[in-house]
A protein has these predicted regions:
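Conserved G/P- and acidic residue-centered "switch" motifs that form tight phosphate/ATP-binding loops
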Residues: 117
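Hydrophobic, aromatic-enriched interface-forming segments
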Residues: 120-122
Length: 248
């Protein structure tokens, strides 16, 4: 008997894009996420940010075996009670609200969650944490992001007794990243499970009380040799969906 193919929800960016004769806002996601999930044996399903008064994010989870929260623009600092820094990018309030609600509903169901870059930051904020809005102010360097449109290569040190180490298959990992923000206050119930070699920037967070809840600041989908997405999809394969009506 063949293994069940898990449905993996993939959150989308909101960007103004040009295609053909049209320029308009669109929901989009880099194909690297889609292909990484498919290579690992999952069925990627794209989830566009939708206002909560139109779609209850928790009802979407009836269709899913796991959620991957993708990278993208900065989160509105108001979501963690701070004013915007001069270097904070223009925010997408609808996406912020949608993903925070989606994560909280997924956590309630103990559905596997993987947060990538911004997605890790969404997990942290959903747990009541806060973000450092511009790391170069403190670090006095910007090695966590490459030139425009290019990922930076660096290394992270992973705690040996962590989900991050189990998923990555190593405690010292070469990664690709592109970010200027990071975790300043870790969310309630989360643990730091990886840090950047050299400057100690928080690179991974997880909730050991959950089946699989992991956020990484790097981009595992950009490296075909990376094992994280595969570990996540395997956990999704074993997940059991719990329809909303049955929980009522």
């Amino acid at each position: 008997m063949s293994e069940r193919t898990p449905n993996v929800g993939v959150t989308c960016n909101v960007e103004v894009v040009k295609y053909g004769l049209w320029t308009e806002p669109a929901a989009m996601v880099p194909l690297t996420y889609v292909r990484a999930i498919a290579r690992a044996g999952g069925r990627p399903l794209l989830i566009a940010p939708t206002p909560a008064d139109l779609v209850d994010p928790s009802e979407l989870l009836d269709l899913l075996d796991g959620v991957l929260i993708t990278g993208g623009a900065d989160i509105d600092p108001a979501a963690y009670g701070e004013q915007s820094h001069a270097e904070t990018e223009p925010v997408t309030a609808d996406r912020d609200a949608f993903e925070l609600a989606l994560v909280r509903a997924a956590v309630e169901r103990d559905l596997p969650c993987l947060g990538v870059c911004r997605g890790m930051q969404v997990l942290n904020v959903a747990y009541g944490g806060a973000l450092e809005q511009h790391l170069p102010d403190r670090l006095e360097h910007d090695i966590h992001r490459g030139d425009a449109g290019e990922f930076a290569d660096h290394r992270v040190e992973v705690e040996p007794d962590s989900l991050a180490a189990l998923a990555a298959g190593a405690t010292h990992v070469a990664v690709k990243s592109y970010h200027h923000q990071g975790v300043s206050r870790v969310g309630d119930g989360l643990r730091v499970s990886a840090r950047a070699e050299g400057d100690g920037t928080v690179e991974a967070i997880e909730d050991a009380r959950r089946r699989f809840l992991l956020g990484v600041l790097w981009h595992p989908e950009e490296d075909e040799a990376d094992r994280l997405v595969g570990a996540f999809v395997r956990e999704c394969r074993g997940a059991t969906r719990e329809p909303t009506a049955q929980r009522a």
